Amino acid sequence: MKAIIVLLMVVTSNADRICTGITSSNSPHVVQTATQGEVNVTGVIPLTTTPTKSHFANLKGTKTRGKLCPKCLNCTDLDVALARPKCTGTIPSAKASILHEVKPVTSGCFPIMHDRTKIRQLPNLLRGYEHIRLSTHNVINAETAPGGPYKIGTSGSCPNVTNGNGFFATMAWAVPKNDNNKTATNPLTVEIPYICTEGEDQITVWGFHSDNEAQMVKLYGDSKPQKFTSSANGVTTHYVSQIGGFPNQAEDGGLPQSGRIVVDYMVQKSGKTGTITYQRGILLPQKVWCASGRSKVIKGSLPLIGERDCLHEKYGGLNKSKPYYTGEHAKAIGNCPIWVKTPLKLANGTKYRPPAKLLKER
């Protein structure tokens, strides 16, 4: 059998070119590679975004806490933390919390010497727990505490729900009940039991009252500075009261007060007892906070509007449109993009190849 060979001849002119291999049009996309530096590619997918500032929002898939007690109207977070009259209510559980007051504003009710203690940290301490509740029972009987019997002091600046005189539910203002025990006393000690459910932290609020010399004698029978100490969970704190030198001060339109109170708290771990050593003017602990779980806390602002994937301290609420972001680096919680210094691109095409030239026919 004879083989038949068919020859295909292509006749070209001097101006003709034949392009072979992969070709593409010119590309504006440039990517930075580890081995070849800048490389032109036929296509890229941007992986980064630069957010714009927005309002804070609820975190998708979880409850987000703004104010400690949303239904406690006209109450600061410190009012709620101290259980001021008319400022007690349910604190919703939350796995994420907005720290909207870096330095919580003052409580009303009675003039507090905030700068002597860490009391302004109390709302933010509570905010860091997922579950928070105020005990239904008092931790001790204040009327029969050492140095008593006591009557429980109230203030016209702290109206209760019936608009009578009241005081913070977390503390009892222990005033000697009769003239027989309105005298100076050596330091007295009371044990503060653990009354929360096992596994919860117990946050016990306490403090002391001081006034000018005349009022100290009238209330307590002693005008000298008084000493106070709290101890719990390996932390011991000492105070000496200041006598007099206070200008009259009214809180929230209440009655002017010549005295001041210093308020502090101690954290008692599960099953652990605390102690308070005191003299005259003690504000004995009553209802305590029982707290458990952890809530992720981020600095932000209120109100919370809508829902977002991520909460970012600098940008507010974000939806995750890209896996990475550029711009300001700050704390973020939720389903958040990762911060990178420079934009990232993913090459989804081929390396740009210029058209190949056909050798001219000789």
UniProtKB/Swiss-Prot annotation:
In natural infection, inactive HA is matured into HA1 and HA2 outside the cell by one or more trypsin-like, arginine-specific endoprotease secreted by the bronchial epithelial cells. One identified protease that may be involved in this process is secreted in lungs by club cells. Keywords: Disulfide bond, Fusion of virus membrane with host endosomal membrane, Fusion of virus membrane with host membrane, Glycoprotein, Hemagglutinin, Host cell membrane, Host membrane, Host-virus interaction, Lipoprotein, Membrane, Palmitate, Signal, Transmembrane, Viral attachment to host cell, Viral envelope protein, Viral penetration into host cytoplasm, Virion, Virus entry into host cell. Glycans are attached at N40, N74, N160, N181, N319, N348. GO terms for molecular function: host cell surface receptor binding. Residues 1-15 form the signal peptide. InterPro entries: Capsid_hemagglutn, Hemagglutn_HA1_a/b_dom_sf, Hemagglutn_influenz_A/B. One of its GO terms (cellular component) is membrane. It is found in: Virion membrane; Host apical cell membrane. Its main location: virion. Homotrimer of disulfide-linked HA1-HA2. This is Hemagglutinin.
